[in-house]
């Protein structure tokens, strides 16, 4: 390559996505945090200008739903115009949340924006100062479901200096409805760089060639913890490629584990949470919604199972954060701890608690796959299962095993309370 190339890869912007838990923060921060996805994209646009990139690649799911709201579209186009004013080209593919069939408002894009078609893979030259420095390939979704393996349709043209493939896809599964493909499918296409969308966690799947998920620029709920952002990429004159992940999140979602071992009073427990909050504030330095997972074993287990007490703590901790810039809002508490008890010895006693533990022990001795199957069979055989609806059908193996463990200890607690009563 005679010239170097600079670009930003981002995707899964989800502009207009509702941001939950805003009732817990004051009005000033509701206005700021409420538009966090848009503000995260604003940071990307400003970064593109500051770094004088040649292109911004957007790998699908600009919006959250098929009827993407008008305000989100206006915000998006306004920021695209800002890139146009700085001579930065934009290349975008449409994903499952913003397929071609879902585009309703006729808001024209500036001339610097190229949307890849849905019918076939298109090759578009990236020209800098009159010289083609790269070729960009892409294909968009026509509908929200795309069962075809689109990766098979990509082929590098002879003579490309540097080839970039853009695709909204789920790598690693041929059964997905999101343009499923494998890592080998992508490698065989001859691209020098793959800019992928759909997965919200940033990850480099391969370095030869680079196959990259940028993730989303802003976490949307408590499952999307950690830094969120985009990749800034520099390609040297001879094709050497350097990547830098840059955090663009306006607000963070975080999760911490807090062991209750050795904690013997409610005041100690509350102080431990307060100390953990301050550490998160120092480390992150921006508004944060925090999940606290209580682990270990101790006398505070029973207190943590009291919903009135935990709700009171949540309310008081939230009140402490009002008016703070880098607030750390404890969004939820999860009791993954255990009471102080030797289950092996307790199960030997000839009573209802011992019998209960022996039944659980038989399940726990199963291999993980067998245990999950047994638990699902038990769950699905119950008439109440249908009432769970989509939640029940979406229950992951991990969540099922976690619930099983929690149920064991809750059952022991209830049986012991009944015996004392």
Locations of regions flagged by a protein language model:
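N-terminal active-site segment of His-dependent metallophosphoesterases
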Residues: 1-73, 393, 397-398
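Domain-start "cap" segments at the beginnings of catalytic or binding domains
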Residues: 1-29, 228, 234-259
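Short loop/turn motifs at secondary-structure junctions
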Residues: 4, 52, 132, 190, ...
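Structural signal for conserved beta-strand scaffold positions within catalytic alpha/beta enzyme cores
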Residues: 9, 117, 138, 213, ...
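His/Asp/Glu-rich metal-coordinating catalytic cores
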Residues: 20, 26, 55, 66-242
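Hydrophobic pocket-lining residues that define ligand/cofactor binding sites across diverse proteins
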Residues: 48, 83, 280
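Accessory, non-catalytic peripheral segments of nucleic-acid enzymes
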Residues: 248-421
């Amino acid at each position: 390559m005679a010239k170097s190339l600079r670009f930003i890869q981002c995707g899964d912007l989800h502009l207009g996505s509702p941001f939950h838990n805003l009732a817990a923060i004051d009005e000033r921060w509701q206005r700021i945090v409420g538009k966090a996805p848009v503000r995260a994209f604003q940071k990307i646009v400003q970064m593109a200008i500051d770094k004088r990139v040649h292109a911004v690649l957007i790998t699908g799911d600009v919006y959250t739903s098929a009827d993407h709201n008008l305000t989100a579209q206006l915000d998006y186009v306004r920021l695209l115009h800002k890139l146009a004013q700085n001579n930065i080209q934009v290349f975008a593919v449409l994903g499952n949340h913003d397929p071609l069939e879902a585009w309703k408002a006729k808001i024209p894009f500036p001339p610097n924006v190229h949307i890849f078609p849905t019918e076939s893979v298109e090759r578009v030259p990236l020209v800098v100062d009159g010289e083609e420095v790269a070729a960009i390939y892409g294909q968009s979704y026509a509908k929200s479901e795309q069962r075809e393996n689109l990766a098979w349709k990509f082929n590098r043209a002879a003579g490309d200096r540097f080839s970039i493939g853009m695709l909204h896809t789920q790598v690693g599964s041929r059964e997905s409805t999101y343009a499923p493909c494998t890592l080998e499918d992508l490698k065989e296409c001859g691209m020098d760089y793959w800019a992928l969308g759909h997965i919200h966690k940033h990850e480099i799947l391969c370095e030869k060639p680079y196959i990259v998920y940028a993730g989303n620029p802003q976490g949307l709920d408590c499952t999307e913890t950690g830094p969120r952002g985009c990749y800034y990429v520099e390609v040297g004159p001879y094709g050497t490629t350097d990547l830098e992940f840059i955090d663009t999140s306006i607000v963070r979602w975080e999760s911490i584990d807090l062991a209750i071992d050795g904690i013997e009073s409610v005041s100690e427990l509350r102080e431990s949470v307060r100390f953990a909050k301050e550490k998160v504030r120092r480390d992150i330095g921006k508004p944060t919604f925090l999940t606290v997972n209580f682990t270990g074993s101790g006398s505070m287990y029973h207190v943590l199972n009291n919903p009135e007490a935990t709700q009171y703590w949540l309310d008081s901790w939230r009140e402490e954060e009002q008016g703070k810039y880098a607030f750390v809002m404890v969004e939820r508490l999860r009791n993954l701890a255990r009471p102080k008890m030797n289950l092996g010895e307790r199960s030997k006693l000839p009573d209802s608690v011992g019998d209960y533990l022996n039944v659980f022990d038989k399940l726990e001795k199963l291999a993980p796959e067998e245990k999950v199957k047994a638990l699902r069979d038990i769950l699905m055989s119950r008439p109440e299962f249908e009432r769970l609806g989509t939640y029940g059908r979406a229950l992951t193996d991990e969540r099922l095993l976690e619930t099983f463990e929690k149920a064991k200890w809750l059952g022991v607690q209830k049986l012991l309370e009944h015996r004392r009563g």
